[in-house]
């Protein structure tokens, strides 16, 4: 008779413990119920990127002096700078500038150390293509400014999400 009573008590304790664990999990779930959703409907809604966002690099051909500082500070020696020395004026003339975004790690060193500020980071992050060779941008492709997410009328931007006040 005594083993049957102890088994019944153990069963009751296990049932109470299981109910407590289920209740704790349910309380955690309910604490998340009053939060706003994090996901967005991507092609139709886009988050506005921060000022410090490191997207595609924009290049201004006229400002570049072909000093190759960007190549030296790049951890993977990525920018390809072709130049020709003009002997009559003793200056370099830039012929070609290209960056392969399939290899670029978007560290921003080239932008930070450029002495003439001819490189800048944009908010463009949609660089996906079917062919990896299309990610090799020359100076013409790098010079195009992307359409701003803010200016695109087809997309609803989510900038300031209302905060829920806990009282």
UniProtKB/Swiss-Prot annotation:
Class of enzymatic activity (EC top level): translocase
Ranges where the 4Fe-4S ferredoxin-type domain occurs: 55-84, 95-124
One Pfam family matching this protein: Fer4
Domain of life (superkingdom): Eukaryota
A Gene Ontology biological process term: photosynthesis, light reaction
Localization per Swiss-Prot or TrEMBL: Plastid, Chloroplast thylakoid membrane
Binding site for [4Fe-4S] cluster 1: 64, 67, 70, 114
Residues the entry annotates as binding [4Fe-4S] cluster 2: 74, 104, 107, 110
An annotated GO cellular component: chloroplast thylakoid membrane
Reaction catalysed by this enzyme: a plastoquinone + NADH + (n+1) H(+)(in) = a plastoquinol + NAD(+) + n H(+)(out); a plastoquinone + NADPH + (n+1) H(+)(in) = a plastoquinol + NADP(+) + n H(+)(out)
Cofactor(s) the protein requires to work: [4Fe-4S] cluster
GO molecular function: 4 iron, 4 sulfur cluster binding; iron ion binding; NADH dehydrogenase (ubiquinone) activity; quinone binding
Membership in a protein family: Belongs to the complex I 23 kDa subunit family.
Subunit description: NDH is composed of at least 16 different subunits, 5 of which are encoded in the nucleus.
Official protein name in the record: NAD(P)H-quinone oxidoreductase subunit I, chloroplastic
UniProt organism field: Nicotiana tabacum
Lineage: Eukaryota, Viridiplantae, Streptophyta, Embryophyta, Tracheophyta
Originating gene: ndhI
